[in-house]
Amino acid sequence: MEKARPQWGHPLQFVFACISYAVGLGNVWRFPYLCQMYGGGSFLVPYIIMLIVEGMPLLYLELAVGQRMRQGSIGAWRTISPYLSGVGVASVVVSFFLSMYYNVINAWGFWYLFHSFQDPLPWSVCPLNSNHTGYDEECEKASSTQYFWYRKTLNISPSIQENGGVQWEPALCLTLAWLMVYLCILRGTESTGKVVYFTASMPYCVLIIYLVRGLTLHGATNGLMYMFTPKMEQLANPKAWINAATQIFFSLGLGFGSLIAFASYNEPSNNCQKHAIIVSIINSSTSIFASIVTFSIYGFKATFNYENCLNKVILLLTNSFDLEDGFLTVSNLEEVKNYLASTYPNKYSEVFPHIRNCSLESELDTAVQGTGLAFIVYTEAIKNMEVSQLWSVLYFFMLLMLGIGSMLGNTAAILTPLTDSKVISSYLPKEAISGLVCLINCAVGMVFTMEAGNYWFDIFNDYAATLSLLLIVLVETIAVCYVYGLKRFESDLRAMTGRTLSWYWKVMWAFVSPLLIVGLFIFYLSDYILTGTLQYQAWDATQGQLVTKDYPPHALAVIGLLVASSTMCIPLVALGTFIRNRLKRGGSAPVA
């Protein structure tokens, strides 16, 4: 007798699992960057439009497929057509790539969390040099937060060609991160269903605390005004629309197979349409909410740096011209500078090269995303807060909850097809399958703990999923609407849920969403081709800053392999199925 499929203990567990998976680090460190780059409040216009015409429909499609087929990604697409098994295989491959490197972020989160209990915070001041005669030269040229990130955390090499060895401290943190994930997925939906209540809700508690604190910080209004002041001319910028569509697409986690896996454990009568709308709205609302928190803190940091810059100029002029202490202030600085320049032109010309150009606008214009925002910009702001240890612990605890929540979805996309397989599950219990997947990912992930590990992390982050996911979701929409048949799928949904599919979903699935995906695919493909030689940012310790370098041939080969290994699964599996069917027909033909 076939074993009954596990189910979520309560529909809320499914919703929380989807929220925990979809609401991730990208909401905190990518969406605020896009707002900053593409017109502040005006970026919300293309973002909301793309949510309606792309995000919600595609999320509903994946949830409906998982709930209808009641299998992981491979089995679900094989049920629709044996020739489409490669879509599920491609999803598993991409999820495997993502799991390899994504948990490294959680390892860094653990590293910073452990160091957050020190007083003072280790990234708040530069260490002394070996002679104890001054500060470390690399740290002085960069900043204390950059030094802690690039030298103490990553111990980064000058280029991707100098790999170095595995570093034991990051390796231990990565092992701990994978142990945490394993404990959360150990019993399948039984354990994951309980964990997601915490991983989904805890980040909101921290964000609310940070919002209250952020709004009371000096200069917070400068950041919020910068965010909410719309630059309407950006609406005519095609890249604003492309990035809005891309952010919606990747933020919801479409194409990985995680959503299909989660939905496969639902009751067939579950209202997945309602849940798709809820999850997509909560995900986008979280991005906007996180941006308000980020920009309030960003405004504090920018104002702090701006005023610090002004104070250094005041000190320089006061000492150079023997002015009375307190005579020169921020309010009369420009007036006094003009007076000194006209009265003492020769002396002022000597001092002028050392006078820094202080600008609040330029501080706010400094756009940073990804690990730079999470581990450098935020820590720069935190170190200047009162009771900085508390805010640091809260912040990195939140990052860990977001990261682990996303990892639960990533691993579900891999594990569900494996546990669905009768061959594999007949030999190994699900605890052993989960353990093997975590162990393999952890072992391969050690590459990212080497001195050149951050460069390999960037390669995986930039190239392992982008084109592959667009192709996967495009084939998914074509498969449902034109292979399985939209009318047939509509009939299935009506039989399952008792609800009729509205014209909106049908138009989006059949026409609008596929055309948008094709447009994104063409954009990214042409962008890669027109870019020419692919480049990366390397840390130069002698200058204390990032420099641009060309990827070496072996790195380009890895990039090509990452893109091809997942995208080629779709045509290769289809071709293999076709050949196998032809051979079966040929073998079963009657002998004359």
Swiss-Prot record:
Pfam families: SNF (PF00209). GO terms for cellular component: apical plasma membrane. Keywords: Amino-acid transport, Cell membrane, Glycoprotein, Membrane, Symport, Transmembrane, Transmembrane helix, Transport. It is a multi-pass membrane protein. GO terms for molecular function: amino acid transmembrane transporter activity; L-proline transmembrane transporter activity; neutral L-amino acid transmembrane transporter activity; proline:sodium symporter activity; solute:sodium symporter activity. The chain crosses the membrane at residues 8-28, 43-63, 80-100, 166-186, 195-215, 242-262, 277-297, 390-410, 432-452, 466-486, 505-525, 555-575. GO terms for biological process: amino acid transport; amino-acid betaine transport; glycine import across plasma membrane; L-proline import across plasma membrane; proline import across plasma membrane; proline transmembrane transport. This is Sodium- and chloride-dependent transporter XTRP3A. The lineage of its organism: Eukaryota, Metazoa, Chordata, Craniata, Vertebrata.
